[in-house]
Curated annotation (Swiss-Prot):
It is found in: Cell membrane. The keyword Cell membrane applies. Keywords: Cell membrane, Membrane, Transmembrane, Transmembrane helix. This is UPF0756 membrane protein ETA_17460. One of its GO terms (cellular component) is plasma membrane. It is a multi-pass membrane protein.
């Protein structure tokens, strides 16, 4: 029997691969393996906790240079003294807030996830974008829809 969901996931994985969005490719392939094995019983947990675990791992990656000392504390302190750094802080706050709205939208309206992924893949492949867009795109969409 034809599995449309599997076909869509394989199509998105191929599209991601050819647009050099390896993180999405790997994520989709892992989900395909989970779907096709007894591990599929972990989907309720993944659906409930996946975003939280992913954000924890992302936060660890972002904070690692501070923890390791690659970014010295003196550099962090100077961030509060220069207009460019203050602007960067303000933008960081805005983008974090936007990403939070995106997580909420993606959790409450999963029908938008496919469109956000396809838009990100097109942005990466055709416009030399960077594949960090789905959460921010969802946040912008939530502003447009008035959700969150």
């Amino acid at each position: 029997m034809f599995d449309l969901t599997l076909a869509i996931m394989l199509f998105l994985a191929a599209l991601s691969y050819f647009s050099h969005n390896i993180t999405v490719t790997i994520a989709l392939l892992v989900l395909i393996v989970i779907r096709m094995t007894p591990l599929q019983q972990t989907f309720p947990w993944i659906e409930k906790q996946g975003m939280t675990v992913g954000i924890i791992i992302l936060t660890i990656g972002v904070m690692a240079p501070i923890a390791s000392g690659t970014i010295p504390s003196s550099t962090l302190m100077h961030s509060f003294l220069h207009w460019k750094s203050l602007t960067a802080i303000a933008i960081g706050i805005f983008v974090s807030w936007l990403g939070g709205r995106g997580v909420t939208l993606m959790s409450t309206q999963p029908t938008v996830v496919g469109g956000l992924l396809i838009g990100t893949i097109i942005g990466v492949s055709l416009f030399r974008g960077v594949p960090v867009g789905p959460l921010i795109a969802a946040g912008l969409l939530s502003l447009m829809l008035g959700k969150g």
